[in-house]
Amino acid sequence: LPDNVLEGGRPKVVEPDAPWVRVWKNQSWQIALFALVLVAVTVVYAFREKLTRLSTHKNKWPVNAFKYSFWAISMAWIGFGLMAQPSITQVLTWFHALLFQWTWSLFLSDPFIFLFWIFIIVTVFLFGRGLFCGWMCPFGSLQETIFKIAKALGLKRFQTQVPQKWHDRLKWLKYAVFFFLLTVSMFSMGLAEKLSEVEPFKTTFLVGVMNRSWPYGLFVAAILGVSIFIERPYCKYICPLGASLAMPSTFRWFGLKRKQDCNSCKACAVGCGAQAIDADGRIDHRECLHCLDCMILYTDTKGCPPLAKERKRREKDGLEITPIGVNGYFIPIHPATSHADQISAKAAKGPDPRMPTDPTLPAHKRGVGFVAWFFLELRDHIWPWSTEGWRSQRALQVAGLSLAVAATVAWGMAAVGSLSSSAIIAWWFGWSLYEVLIRLSGRRYVKDGPWWRDHYRVAGVMDMLSYVGFKNLLIGAALFLALKSMGVSL
């Protein structure tokens, strides 16, 4: 009926808020406080070099006061209070949403998890996974707190590390768990969620140990019991969430500092609870949990053996004790001189520990202008074949061309509705694995640090898996989106 014939006019219809909007409104002050905590830990970590310079190997409180405070907050308030422990199930859901259908209301339904993931994504690409895993993960903080308390109670003599050779093997287990869950999720998300009980987070924080059957409680108790004697065992060897964050950590913009002498000095490696420093003094940022102990030693004139040696020499000769420069060495007494004379002969001949692997620069990237650099960069991402690869592994390269053609045909079949989404994902996954092999035989390099710089280094297997996996995930998501925009039902 027209408005003029209705007594009192047409009634105003008030549309109710969406469920996620009501959640955000009802918890607004807690959300604001949670966001403030995330900003605070990021700012504190951004000033890590100032804090580590204020610390020594005997007094780490300028760093630990903040770190322990955030552990307490993450355990007591974020974990047990807000029940906002991030989980691998959210990573799997994100993969599915990216490939099939992105629904904002799904991710906005839990504001704390939503904000936590914004924090995680930003900081992983800035610093690596260590800020979340080492400072803000509720379960990780719980493990480390138990380890520290046990140490303070006199159990230090029983605490140990897994022998390095076994650690270097066992650390791959968490990646296997992650890839297994990811593969299962592509065929059955329900089954993947059940298998994700390999995470003790739900039992610990969401449901409670006393509210679940005994196998779940026993699993949590076993992990926390082992944590008394081994630092963060779950984080280092089992956690699929940590593995999923470790892979993009390969491309973090800012890493922890190393100096040339680190390749022959083992002081930092001995004290590294994450066992993330190798025999050459290089830090594996996929494994590093950012305790910052090595950064404290980096400028500690009494704790760092190379600095202590130089300090004693200067004191004996009555020379000035200058401050420590950004390169980790004493600033030269005479400005015109170099710090190179402070580097031991053994260290000078060894590998450069400032990068995770040996630096390199592809020949075709040398001395080119911006336009040429841009097209070469694009070609590097899309075209994995190389002259070096053809020379060393011609059969592998030819087979790769055949598989690439097959993958292209598979996408074409998907475009006309002749191939299911599961089949195209299987094809794309197979091609991605083969692309790793092709690149390792020729274009064996990845970037270290910001993507717009030409800081290349030799790629290890996990470096290449991380690079190809992340790149092809984005390409696959873009192709799925294009097919959907064309009206193709997948």
What positions do the PLM features span?
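Membrane-interface helix-boundary motifs at transmembrane edges
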Residues: 52-63, 387-390, 415-419, 456-457
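Loop-to-transmembrane boundary segments
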Residues: 158-183, 280-281, 386-398, 457-478
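Non-ligating segments of multi-cofactor redox enzymes
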Residues: 2-279, 286-287, 293-350, 479-480, ...
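Canonical alpha-helical transmembrane segments of integral membrane proteins
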Residues: 37-40, 75-76, 183, 395-415, ...
